């Protein structure tokens, strides 16, 4: 006679939650972003390039009222609201997150978004209108900070994961429709 289920699922039967990994990646990106911005503001002369590798890679301190890589300048309050929505959405999604790769990608986006939000809320000219500190210049690319490539890299990772069939709420690749019917 088979045993009746007790109604509780053993911890090893449940897929692992990845919120801790997501938050660790986000905290690392956020800390790097804040520390590098504080150092840039303290040590770099505004608008004057400091060569690192010739004229190709320089430290160049600028204040950016736009989005990543100086896009959407002049829409600071809209960008602040969008970034706040992204942060809230990632926290909401994080409760159901199972995939470690999605945790890394979302953590990169969360850390970068929060890094730039810190500037938007606490830097001049004022809350919701603060300008983001950018200081890395590579070739012809717009000046950026640690948060910008983190957000872009995290987004690229999520697109690649989606293309190859990895969902945020499963451990591996999703099964094809014909395999799941067997």
Swiss-Prot record:
Reaction(s) catalysed (UniProt annotation): Release of signal peptides from bacterial membrane prolipoproteins. Hydrolyzes -Xaa-Yaa-Zaa-|-(S,diacylglyceryl)Cys-, in which Xaa is hydrophobic (preferably Leu), and Yaa (Ala or Ser) and Zaa (Gly or Ala) have small, neutral side chains
GO molecular function, one term: aspartic-type endopeptidase activity
Top enzyme category: hydrolase
PROSITE patterns attached to this UniProt entry: SPASE_II
Keyword Membrane annotated: yes
Subcellular location: Cell membrane
Catalytic residues (positions): 134, 148
Keywords: Aspartyl protease, Cell membrane, Hydrolase, Membrane, Protease, Transmembrane, Transmembrane helix
GO CC annotations on file: plasma membrane
InterPro entries to which the protein is assigned, alphabetical: Peptidase_A8
Topology of the protein relative to the lipid bilayer: Multi-pass membrane protein
Pfam families on file: Peptidase_A8
EC number per UniProt: 3.4.23.36
Biological processes, Gene Ontology terms: proteolysis
Pathway: Protein modification; lipoprotein biosynthesis (signal peptide cleavage)
TM region(s), chain numbering: 21-41, 74-94, 98-118, 146-166
Principal location listed in the UniProt entry: membrane
Record's keyword annotation contains Thylakoid: no
Coiled coil: none
Family: Belongs to the peptidase A8 family.
General function of this protein: This protein specifically catalyzes the removal of signal peptides from prolipoproteins.
Protein name: Lipoprotein signal peptidase
Organism: Mycobacterium avium (strain 104)
Gene this chain is encoded by: lspA
């Amino acid at each position: 006679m088979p045993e009746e289920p007790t109604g509780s699922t053993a911890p090893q039967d449940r897929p692992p939650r990845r919120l801790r990994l997501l938050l660790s990646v986000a905290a690392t990106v956020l800390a790097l972003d804040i520390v590098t911005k504080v150092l840039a503001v303290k040590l770099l002369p505004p608008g004057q390039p400091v060569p690192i590798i010739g004229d190709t890679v320089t430290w160049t301190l600028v204040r950016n009222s736009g989005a990543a890589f100086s896009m959407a300048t002049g829409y600071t309050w809209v960008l602040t609201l969008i970034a706040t929505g992204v942060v809230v959405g990632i926290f909401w999604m994080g409760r159901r997150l199972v995939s470690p790769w999605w945790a890394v990608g979302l953590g990169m986006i969360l850390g970068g978004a929060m890094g730039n939000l810190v500037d938007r809320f606490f830097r001049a000219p004022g809350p919701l209108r603060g300008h983001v500190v950018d200081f890395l210049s590579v070739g012809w690319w717009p000046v950026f900070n640690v948060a910008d490539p983190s957000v872009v890299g995290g987004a690229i990772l999520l697109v690649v994961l989606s293309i190859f069939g990895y969902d945020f709420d499963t451990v591996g690749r999703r099964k094809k429709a014909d395999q799941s019917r067997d």
